[in-house]
Amino acid sequence: MSAIIFIVETLLSLALFVVLARLLLQWTRADFRNPLCQAVVRITNPIILPLRRVLPPVGKLDTASVVAVLLIATVDVACIFALHGLGFPPALLWVRPVLTEIARTLLWTYLSAIFLYALLSLIAPGGYSPLQSVLATLCEPVLRPIRRLIPAVAGLDLSPLWAIIAIQAVLILMR
């Protein structure tokens, strides 16, 4: 039974990650001609396009992506409750676990993105790759305020380190 729980939780977490990544890429105005962005769009289109017919965007906010994130997180929490034999709580008690799951996935997404961004900048500084372009677009809105507070030391940008520490602290507090 634990193998089934692991597989279901992993698949739903990956689905939530990909749809959340699409929302973040739209929010940061990533270049959707980038091959990685195109892959995310192709993977998420079966979920997003039917919702978009019903839920048009409101300003810059893609409501279809937001609703997809909420739906997948709700299904994820429901499956976790069901597979662990906890039953289904009343609707109002779902709000906190669903929002916690979304926040946790968002934080892990940014933690991973910032780590990869810092690693790529150390391995190939000034180089270009589709991954590096997407990571820069995602990470800069988070790293820019930290850079204003903590300047580079001897040419070494420590903002990714501080961002990772802050994200880890928030993840620990969420336990």
Give residue spans per PLM region:
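Selective transmembrane helix interface/packing segments
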Residues: 1-175
